[in-house]
């Protein structure tokens, strides 16, 4: 089963993203975290394939958290989500090894779905989030 964690302190945005992903990818297990500490706990217990990471989080910066996660779990795909689409953040996201960067203000659900489908395929999952069986 494909596992995702949504690390976002804005509850409305997090729930909207969760609902959209669940509708599009019904077999995907989705966990949520409202801050960096909760995210680290969920990573240890869930072993996710994908993380959607906000930059501005209570307690810990999402970029620093991304760097920490990538050092421990380089196989996890991390998508940065931010309302602050400035070159410095894009550069920092790349420097800290984030895999993708989306501006919350300009991203569309179709773009997110297409990217998630691509990640599913790359990691050996079916488009609905279930694991491919080898024959």
Predicted regions and their residues:
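Two-component/phosphorelay signaling modules centered on CheY-like receiver
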Residues: 11-31
């Amino acid at each position: 089963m494909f596992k995702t964690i949504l690390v976002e302190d804005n509850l409305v945005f997090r729930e909207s993203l969760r609902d959209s992903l669940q509708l599009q990818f019904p077999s995907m297990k989705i966990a949520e975290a409202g801050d960096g500490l909760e995210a680290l706990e969920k990573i240890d217990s869930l072993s996710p394939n994908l993380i959607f990471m906000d930059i501005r989080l209570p307690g810990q910066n999402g970029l620093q958290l991304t760097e920490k996660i990538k050092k421990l779990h380089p196989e996890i795909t991390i998508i940065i989500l931010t309302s602050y689409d400035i070159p410095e953040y894009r550069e920092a996201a790349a420097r800290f090894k984030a895999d993708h960067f989306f501006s919350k203000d300009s991203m569309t659900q179709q773009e997110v779905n297409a990217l998630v489908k691509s990640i599913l395929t790359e990691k050996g999952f079916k488009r609905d989030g279930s694991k491919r069986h080898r024959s």
